Amino acid sequence: MFFEGINDNTYRRFFSQLTPEERRQYFEKIVMRTAPGGILTSFDLLPADMLDTSQRIEARFGFEVREWAIPGKDTVMLPMVHFAKSVGMSNILIGKMGLKKRKYPYVTNVACGIQESFRLDVGDSLGKALSLPESTRIDNKGATWKSSMSVRGGGSLIFEQTFKMKIPEYT
């Protein structure tokens, strides 16, 4: 996971105020919120010195979820993991949008977004995919949202998502 632009600025300040253990705990919470029952198995946050702005922020982490698959009579359903719902300025700003009708514009002062790619290696343990969610593409003046899911060679389930808030003011 990389933090760039406004996310770099915001999260760099946040991470610089945390101890290494508190940083790990932050990502443990993200994993638990994103994949209930998930356990963080590996973690690395770079750069070690958050004041080193010559390097972008990169979080590398692995996690495990036991009994994650939902078995059915003839099929198995896999809940998808979406880290974009738990990290990033766009997520924070969307959470504040909540009105159906606005008397005054919602000013964010920034355009921002998140790009997510998640790979789950299942090999041939689950058999052939019977169905996948349809790809989504919404693109208008204020926002872009694209999502897709596919199965690639060797039994890798790939989920890709891009969300962009393209303007700093919404009416």
Q: What is the meaning of each model-derived region?
A:
Residues 1-171:
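A sensor for short, sequence-defined functional sites
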